[in-house]
């Protein structure tokens, strides 16, 4: 049985809006409390000292300072910290 629909209906024509994910403030850059550091799906980056995590896993600064990225722990997880300037 053929799977061709009459009247030329299209199976395509869907597209989702961009989610603007990724790192917003890089290591060594100054940051103000409340600013977003990383927008992500899941915990690609984990919250370290001076960093909070929103319910959509967004990482944000809890205090003013300088952003630092580090890999540490048994599972080599990537952490984001905010060090006081």
From Swiss-Prot:
The keyword Lyase does not apply. InterPro entries: Ribosomal_bL27 (IPR001684), Ribosomal_bL27_CS (IPR018261). Pfam families: Ribosomal_L27 (PF01016). It comes from Psychrobacter arcticus (strain DSM 17307 / VKM B-2377 / 273-4). This is Large ribosomal subunit protein bL27. It comes from the Bacteria. SUPFAM superfamilies: Ribosomal L27 protein-like (SSF110324). The gene is rpmA. One of its GO terms (molecular function) is structural constituent of ribosome. HAMAP family: Ribosomal_bL27. Belongs to the bacterial ribosomal protein bL27 family.
């Amino acid at each position: 049985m053929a799977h061709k629909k009459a009247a030329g209906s299209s199976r395509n024509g869907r597209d989702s809006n961009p989610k603007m994910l990724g790192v917003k403030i890089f290591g060594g850059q100054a940051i103000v409390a409340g600013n977003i550091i990383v927008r992500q799906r899941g915990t690609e980056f984990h919250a370290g000292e001076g960093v909070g995590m929103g319910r959509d896993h967004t990482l944000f600064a809890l205090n003013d300072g300088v952003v630092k990225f580090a890999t540490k722990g048994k599972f080599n997880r990537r952490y984001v910290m905010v060090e006081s300037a």
